[in-house]
Design a protein with these regions (language model features):
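Two-component/phosphorelay signaling modules centered on CheY-like receiver
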Residues: 14-32
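The feature encodes the CheY-like receiver
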Residues: 17, 59, 87
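Acidic, metal-coordinating helix/loop segments flanking the phosphotransfer/catalytic sites
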Residues: 33-51
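Acidic catalytic/metal-coordinating carboxylates
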Residues: 35-36, 62-65
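Short amphipathic alpha-helix used as the core "switch/output" element in two-component signaling
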Residues: 42, 64-75
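Alpha4 helix (beta4-alpha4-beta5 surface) of REC/receiver domains from two-component response regulators
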Residues: 65, 86-101
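C-terminal output helix
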Residues: 89, 107-117
Length: 130
């Protein structure tokens, strides 16, 4: 039996985490929630994650720093970056580091699910190549 994709949500806003959990689990994916990048890194989740949704502004490591850390650690996790304060420089940094999408909060269901589909397709393509 094929496993359910595991989506990690890293956002310091509990209401955002819960809203994303409700949406993502409603389409059949497993969701794990984290209030900080450090909580995510300290868990066993990175090795199992099929896609990470990262807020830019987090306590401690930012979402962009987490994205870079995962890449340095050899974790090929597709990343979707979400933020309330979108600017061109931050978007350019996220995309240059390999983000699948850079989304401004509030994110619509359709936009997020489309980005998730693209991220999971990239993860599948990476697994086929390796």
């Amino acid at each position: 039996m094929k496993h359910k994709p595991l989506i990690a949500v890293v956002d310091d806003d509990q209401s955002v985490r819960e809203a994303l959990e409700n949406l993502i689990s409603s389409v059949g994916f497993e969701v794990r929630l984290f209030a900080s990048a450090e909580n995510f890194l300290d868990s066993d989740t990175p090795a199992q994650t099929d896609c990470a949704i990262l807020d830019v502004r987090l306590p401690g490591l930012s979402g962009l720093e987490l994205q870079q850390r995962l890449a340095v650690d050899g974790q090929s996790i597709p990343v979707i970056v979400i933020t309330a304060q979108a600017d061109d420089k931050t978007q350019d940094e996220a995309v240059a580091a390999g983000a699948i999408a850079f989304l401004k909060k509030p994110v619509t269901e359709e936009v997020l699910l489309t980005a998730l589909d693209a991220a999971l397709k990239r993860k599948t393509d990476q697994q086929v190549v390796s």
